[in-house]
Amino acid sequence: MSELISVVVPIYNTGKYLVECVEHILKQTYQNIEIILVDDGSTDNSGEICDAFMMQDNRVRVLHQENKGGAAQAKNMGISVAKGEYITIVDSDDIVKENMIETLYQQVQEKDADVVIGNYYNYDESDGNFYFYVTGQDFCVEELAIQEIMNRQAGDWKFNSSAFILPTFKLIKKELFNEVHFSNGRRFDDEATMHRFYLLASKIVFINDNLYLYRRRSGSIMRTEFDLSWARDIVEVFSKKISDCVLAGLDVSVLRIRFVNLLKDYKQTLEYHQLTDTEEYKDICFRLKLFFDAEQRNGKS
């Protein structure tokens, strides 16, 4: 018998897209699902849309938060009430292919995977274009070791490193959420969290296929104007990630290079915004000095 799968959808003011999003979930070829819509204090008509879907289909459950708590809190709330053996997360402005859950779950059945990772393509509202990372000849199904996963998360990889960082288009065994929660109150919560599921998983399978449409919106949180908290958050997130991987006995050399490249980018951004007198700027400069001093000692500069 097929297992129940919980689909958690965090929602904030996405009424413009929400109907299309939920309709595509309801049309999944894998039907043994529950859909948990978490209205994170929306001020548009998102809450009403959620309630209407709940009245139409008994697989839909709705949670309303009175005040906006953030995407991470909304995800955690939905996960906390999920009844499924596996959980997948869908952003409320995105679209899932009708066979996504079936395709991911097939690998659970065939390979007894704790985590199954898909891939996605982009629709950019600013230019009206679709961007694909996977073509026909790129399709593959791979069982991946944790070291390879972390290298692909961090590296300039031939597929799409974001596929391993975003929490969407995946199936994750529910029991892993007993140990891992999304980090609320800062940006890059996905970057801070997803590697922990991989570190705990006994088996991870990757399907390199376009299973999910990710919508890039001009008003989304990751496309808004830079502020100083971005620099604080990225340093905190990568410090945590590197620490976790060191404790797990992994080689962090690829992750270290990615961290340094991000520090360089943020150093330039802070200089552009004339924020060189800040503690954040000084901290980034200190960390870069540690890296370049080590490279010089090792004869790599």
Curated annotation (Swiss-Prot):
Protein's pathway: Protein modification; protein glycosylation
Superkingdom: Bacteria
Family matches, as SUPFAM superfamilies: Nucleotide-diphospho-sugar transferases (SSF53448)
Entries under InterPro entries matching the protein: Glyco_trans_2-like (IPR001173), Nucleotide-diphossugar_trans (IPR029044)
Disulfide bridge map: none
Entry keyword annotation includes Transferase: yes
Gene3D superfamilies, alphabetized: Spore Coat Polysaccharide Biosynthesis Protein SpsA, Chain A
Record keywords, A-Z: Glycosyltransferase, Transferase
GO-annotated biological processes: protein glycosylation
MF term (GO), any: glycosyltransferase activity
More details: Encoded in RD10, a pathogenicity island with an atypical GC content that is associated with invasive pneumococcal disease. Pathogenicity islands account for greater than half the genomic diversity observed between isolates. The main function of this island seems to be correct synthesis and export of pneumococcal serine-rich repeat protein PsrP.
Family recorded in the similarity comment: Belongs to the glycosyltransferase 2 family.
Function: Involved in the polymorphic O-glycosylation of the serine-rich repeat protein PsrP. Catalyzes the third step in glycosylation PsrP in this bacteria. Transfers glucose from UDP-glucose to the terminal glucose moiety of already-glycosylated PsrP (using truncated substrates with PsrP SSR1-GlcNAc-Glc). Has a marked preference for PsrP substrate that has already been modified by GlcNAc and glucose. In vitro has hydrolytic activity against UDP-glucose and to a lesser extent against UDP-galactose.
Protein's name in the database: Glycosyltransferase GlyG
Organism from which the protein derives: Streptococcus pneumoniae serotype 4 (strain ATCC BAA-334 / TIGR4)
Taxonomic classification: Bacteria, Bacillati, Bacillota, Bacilli, Lactobacillales
Name of the gene: glyG
